[in-house]
Amino acid sequence: ITCLDYSADMMGQAQEKADRLHLKNVTFRQGDVGALPFADGAFDIVLSLNGFHAFPDKEAAYREVFRVLKPGGTFCGCFYVKGEQKRTDWFVRHVYEKTGFFTPPYETAFSLKKRLEKLYATVTLGTVKSMAWFVCRKGLR
């Protein structure tokens, strides 16, 4: 298991938790998802939780995840999508953007599904309030 986050603090917290749980097969790296320090096809599974709405270069992040995923591999995760909950959309615009936690532009559930379908052989996507969840399978070629 390889964990990567832009925040060194988050990686430190993750390392501490892994140590408490005596996990031995986990490595931690601080880095940018828009320029992943891994070889093409390095991973069977890529999991991204609550990240894409915060990434400054979303296009690079989508490309890099696809690049490091093995043929037949799975990309899954969840993140905020606009247009599902007016109250959440307001909060994102007026609070999270101003604090730098979220960075536009944001996907809608529809635009996310279309984007993922251009890259992956199969895409399953759903929403729970303003969060989209997805499971994608990369083609074998």
Each model region followed by its residue ranges:
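A short acidic, Gly/Pro-enriched loop at the edge of an enzyme's catalytic core
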Residues: 34-46
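C-terminal alpha-helical "lid/dimerization" subdomain adjacent to the S-adenosyl-L-methionine
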Residues: 76-134
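A short SAM/SAH-binding and catalytic strip from SAM-dependent methyltransferases
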Residues: 45-57
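Short N-terminal helix/helix-N-cap motif within the alpha/beta-hydrolase-1
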Residues: 9, 56-60
